[in-house]
């Protein structure tokens, strides 16, 4: 199967990626191991969204980044943290526009820690979507909004299709092989493969390889975690 952009995983990240690529005209295929898209949690964190602007809330990005890195004992991926802070405003306003398009809005919560040592930043956004918008999930509305828009713009979602192996051309990842009900299917992406498969917290092998400090705290398992991974 050939596509432009292959997205592995249909959670919030995967649905958002698919929606963003499809709205720009890309041929997008999303493969997901469960039987539906997924979205959990009631809200999302953002830095300096337009809702925060309207409330007069401004986050000092430099101070907040330094505090975040310090709380992680300087073991975090600083490049990734910087990218979050620099891209958060644009990305959050993009998602908020999708909520507003169906008559929704967002509440910016004030329930965050003001402690000097474990201080948090304002910016928790809870999406408020009217019933007449017709959303079907009790999970995070943002994921469903992105899924609906991605489908509307032509993205294809293939469910019950876990990716079992990445396909490479030299050092470049060019696709993946999925195991579906009718056997194995190879997907080839001409423009890129995006991994949106969540964290590795439930995978003992990957924790040992990439985050051994996590191993001593035990490996939680949920319905989203392959029993063999633990």
Give residue ranges: language-model regions.
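Loop/turn elements at helix/coil->beta-strand transitions in domains of secreted/extracellular proteins
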Residues: 2-5, 24-27, 152-156, 190-192
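Conserved redox-cofactor binding core of oxidoreductases
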Residues: 86-184, 190, 204-205
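Glycine-rich loop(s) and the adjacent beta-strand/alpha-helix scaffold that form part
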Residues: 181-183, 188-229
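Short, solvent-exposed loop/turn and secondary-structure capping segments
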Residues: 39-43, 49, 204-208
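N-terminal Rossmann-like FAD-binding beta1-loop-alpha1 element of flavoenzymes
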Residues: 5-29
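Glycine-rich active-site loop/strand segments that organize a redox cofactor
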Residues: 47-84
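Glycine-rich FAD pyrophosphate-binding loop
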Residues: 22-43
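Short glycine-enriched loops at secondary-structure junctions
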Residues: 34, 50-52, 111-113, 193, ...
């Amino acid at each position: 199967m050939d596509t432009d952009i292959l997205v592995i995983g249909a959670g919030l990240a995967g649905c958002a990626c698919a929606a963003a690529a499809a709205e720009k005209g890309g041929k997008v295929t999303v493969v997901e191991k469960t039987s539906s898209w997924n979205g959990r949690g009631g809200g999302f964190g953002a830095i300096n969204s337009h809702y925060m602007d309207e409330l007069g809330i401004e986050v000092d990005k430099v101070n907040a980044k330094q505090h975040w890195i310090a709380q992680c004992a300087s073991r975090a991926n600083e490049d990734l943290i910087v990218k979050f802070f620099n891209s958060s405003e644009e990305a959050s306003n993009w998602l908020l526009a999708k909520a507003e398009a169906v008559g929704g809005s967002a509440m910016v919560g004030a329930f965050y820690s003001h402690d000097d040592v474990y201080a948090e930043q304002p910016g928790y956004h809870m999406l408020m979507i009217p019933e007449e918008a017709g959303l079907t999930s009790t999970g995070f509305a943002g994921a469903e909004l992105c899924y609906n828009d991605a489908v509307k713009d032509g993205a294809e979602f293939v469910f019950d299709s876990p990716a079992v192996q990445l396909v490479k051309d030299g050092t470049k990842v060019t696709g993946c092989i999925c195991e579906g009900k009718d056997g194995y299917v190879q997907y080839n992406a001409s423009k890129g493969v995006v991994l949106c498969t969540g964290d590795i917290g439930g995978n003992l092998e990957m924790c040992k390889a990439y985050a051994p400090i996590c191993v001593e705290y035990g490996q939680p398992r949920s319905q989203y975690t392959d029993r063999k991974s633990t």
